[in-house]
Curated annotation (Swiss-Prot):
Pfam families: Ribosomal_L1. One of its GO terms (biological process) is translation. Part of the 50S ribosomal subunit. Belongs to the universal ribosomal protein uL1 family. Keywords: Repressor, Ribonucleoprotein, Ribosomal protein, RNA-binding, rRNA-binding, Translation regulation, tRNA-binding. One of its GO terms (molecular function) is tRNA binding. Binds directly to 23S rRNA. The L1 stalk is quite mobile in the ribosome, and is involved in E site tRNA release. This is Large ribosomal subunit protein uL1. GO terms for cellular component: large ribosomal subunit.
Length: 235
């Protein structure tokens, strides 16, 4: 049995060192896969921004048309009628100060997304040490601090993902599973790239997308030609 190192080397040899159209890259990524599990497919964008400057930070959310292959577990922190709305919309966990206390005392994080109403943020804000490092802190910019908790829950369940630049200017987001039909992965990736293009800060000068790569958990990275998608996003 070949070692993983030899397997990834064999996979890399089947990928040419050139940018591929998404429609060609996705089937190639699926062809060279060797892992025995259903890998996550990720898209990484290298942007021509300086994240040290607040006016060049790229951040946003987008609902991927075909989801991510798994339903996210959603926690809603609210009170009164908003709790009932969240439950009706399909939230997995719903509570108020009791949930805040549980997270603070136990470091509880058995969920994928947290939605809060504005009135609860005074308490939720104290959970920064637990939620912050995991990217779970509710934020108005990503639609997770809202009075419309029902819509927020439905969007997250439908495949809403957040994207933001890290300190090196990279955006790294999952776009589905390797088992997805190729056209669904192409749709999801195109939707993400389009959203990132539309989120370009006015302060960013020069070439915006400097590189784009599609990869799976264990597989090689494939360079993507985003020219056509960028042009369509601006039209």
């Amino acid at each position: 049995m070949a070692k993983p190192g030899k397997k990834i080397e064999a996979a890399r040899k089947q990928v040419e060192v050139r940018p591929y159209a998404l429609q060609d890259a996705v089937p190639l990524l699926q062809k060279v896969k060797f892992a025995k599990f259903d890998e996550t497919v990720d898209l990484t964008l290298r942007l021509g921004v300086d994240p040290k400057h607040a006016d060049q930070m790229v951040r946003g959310t987008v609902v991927l048309p075909h989801g991510l292959g798994k339903t996210k577990i959603v926690l809603v922190i609210a009170s009164g009628e908003k709790q009932r709305e969240a439950e009706a919309a399909g939230a997995d966990f719903v509570g108020g100060e009791d949930m805040v206390e549980k997270i603070a005392k136990e470091g509880w994080t058995d969920y994928d997304a947290v939605i809060s109403t504005p009135d609860m943020m005074r308490s939720v804000g104290k959970l920064g040490k637990v939620l912050g490092p995991r990217g779970l802190m509710p934020n108005p910019k990503t639609g997770t601090v809202t009075t419309d908790v029902a819509s927020a829950v439905r969007e997250v369940k439908a495949g809403k993902v957040e994207f933001r630049t890290d300190k090196t200017g990279l955006v790294h987001v999952p776009v589905g599973k390797i088992s997805f039909p190729p056209d669904k992965l192409v749709d999801n990736a195109t939707t993400l790239i389009t959203s990132v293009v539309k989120a370009k800060p006015s302060a960013a000068k020069g070439k915006y997308i400097k590189g784009c790569y599609l990869s799976s958990t264990m597989g090689p990275g494939i360079s993507i030609d985003t020219t056509a998608i960028e042009a369509a996003s601006k039209s």
